Each structure stands twice: as structure tokens, then as C-alpha cells.
């Protein structure tokens, strides 16, 4: 279980309050697929991902970005039980979808870049530290089935 200070909880909540899932989700997944092209192998049914423009204009990529961020947002309401909250998703991604668990980390890195771009100087080092701790807890929970 991850231990959270009151300040860390406030910082994570503050970051989430600045995130528009419908905007940041697609941007984060698009960035992930472009910067780390090997992650595209899990999205063959999404159609054309052959160019940056194709990825950015792909409605299935955008929709899945929203799904991914909506799922990530779930942890905010379950910060004291993140591992159990993501147990079923961990099983799905490992046993059925066979997703490399490092891809969760890559997506979260891309999300942090998107969030930092949106928040600018309002994303203080303390806020970022709490945000990174939150993302690491979720990534660990999603990768739990692989251990």
C-alpha cells in the first residue's frame, strides 16, 4: 500500500482538476504512439497508424486515450487501494492483451509531458513529485499480474 500525505493528496487532486480527459487523453496516447512507435503493435485494429498525421487524426486513438485516462482517473477515488482497484485490468492486460507492462510507464511519461504543457509554471515541483508518485503507483498496480 502506498502511503500518502495530505499534501500529496491535495497535489494529485489539483493536477486532476486541471486535466480535461477528452483533450489530454488523446494527446497523451498520440504522443506515446508517435514517440514510442513499437507501442503501436497493440492497436492493429485501429487502422492507419503509419504517420504522425494518421495517428493524430485517428478517432480510435483519441477514443482510447479518453478510455485510458478515465481509467487512470479511477485511482484518485481509491488512492489507498490502488492495487486492488486495478487488479482486473492488470489481469486483462497481461493474460488477454499481452501488453508489455513498460508501456504503462511510457504512456504516463507522455501524460506528464502533456499535463506540464497545459499547466506550465502552475505545476510546481512538489505537485509533480506527488503526480509522479501517483502515476508510479498505478503503473505498479497495472503491472502486478506480470510479477
UniProtKB/Swiss-Prot annotation:
Domain (Globin): residue spans on this chain: 3-147
InterPro entries xref list: Globin (IPR000971), Globin-like_sf (IPR009050), Globin/Proto (IPR012292), Hemoglobin_b (IPR002337), Hemoglobin_oxygen_transport (IPR050056)
This protein's UniProt keywords: Heme, Iron, Metal-binding, Oxygen transport, Transport
Disulphide-bridged cysteine pairs: none
Gene3D superfamilies on file: Globins
Binding site for heme b: 64, 93
One function term, GO molecular function aspect: oxygen carrier activity
GO cellular component terms, semicolon-separated: blood microparticle; haptoglobin-hemoglobin complex; hemoglobin complex
Family: Belongs to the globin family.
Protein name: Hemoglobin subunit beta-1
Organism: Gadus morhua
Amino acid at each position: 500500500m502506498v502511503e500518502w500525505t495530505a499534501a500529496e493528496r491535495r497535489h494529485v487532486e489539483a493536477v486532476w482538476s486541471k486535466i480535461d480527459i477528452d483533450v489530454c487523453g488523446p494527446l497523451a496516447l498520440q504522443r506515446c504512439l508517435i514517440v514510442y512507435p513499437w507501442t503501436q503493435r497493440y492497436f492493429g485494429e485501429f487502422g492507419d497508424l503509419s504517420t504522425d498525421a494518421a495517428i493524430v487524426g485517428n478517432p480510435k486513438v483519441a477514443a482510447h486515450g479518453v478510455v485510458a485516462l478515465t481509467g487512470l482517473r479511477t485511482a484518485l477515488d481509491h488512492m489507498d487501494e490502488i492495487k486492488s482497484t486495478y487488479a482486473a485490468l492488470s489481469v486483462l492486460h497481461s493474460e488477454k492483451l499481452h501488453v508489455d507492462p513498460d508501456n504503462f510507464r511510457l504512456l504516463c511519461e507522455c501524460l506528464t509531458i502533456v499535463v506540464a504543457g497545459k499547466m506550465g509554471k502552475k505545476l510546481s515541483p512538489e505537485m509533480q513529485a506527488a503526480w509522479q508518485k501517483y502515476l508510479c503507483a498505478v503503473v505498479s498496480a497495472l503491472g502486478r499480474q506480470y510479477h
